[in-house]
Amino acid sequence: MRKMKRFVRCRVLVSALAVISALAMASCEEHVEIYDSSIKVGNILLSDNTVISPYGYDRDSHMAVGVIFYTNEDTVLVVGTKELGSHIYTDSIGTVSNVTNDVVSLCGAENTAAILSSGFHSPAVEAVKAFCSPVSGWVLPSAGELKALSRNLAVVSVSMKAIGGDAFTNWQYLSSSQDGSSTDSEKMYYYSVSLVNGFITSVLKTTEGCVRPVIRIR
């Protein structure tokens, strides 16, 4: 009987220790999440160019400018907090030189620079350049960048809501990429992307699409 009592007490003690250990681990993991400043999808870029986890974000003491939506060894992309309305690619038809015209390249910065240096007037690019933010360097995303955002939209949307940013729409988003499938299509069309499903559409350059700015921080 005494052996049985010792055995029961031992099992109770082991169970209690297991519960305490589990609670301690959970508390530790929560602490790590709150102070996670790593470069990863879903973390938040602040106005002082630092990064914070959405779990540690405080609207009273932090100023968010965007959410990380893509990372690899040499590239980190952030999407801005604001929708910039619907705009057209250009107000006239023609090929913009030095724009990368495919659906995979992460080249919004280069494409935006090419559009700005061309003779074409782009209301979409103008909207991005007029975007008011404490961080500079926002661009019109390429089709490849919008596709990358689409792939991580669920995670990004949770963080965007946490910081009070605009929700993403269900409409097609205008990219800085022309339709490169032929010489004629480059003149006439740009690629638009649905963030909901990643679907890409070739759209006449004088047709409006939603504009959301992005920035490359590495």
Q: Residues of each region from the PLM?
A:
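Compositionally biased, low-complexity segments enriched in small residues
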Residues: 1, 16, 107-108, 165
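C-terminal motif of bacterial Sec signal peptides marking the signal peptidase cleavage site
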Residues: 23-27
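An exposed tryptophan-centered "aromatic clamp" motif
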Residues: 121-138, 143-195, 199-201
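Bacterial N-terminal signal peptides that target proteins for export
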Residues: 2-15
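Short, compositionally biased
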Residues: 28-134, 205-218
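Processing junctions and N-termini across compartments
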Residues: 19-22, 207
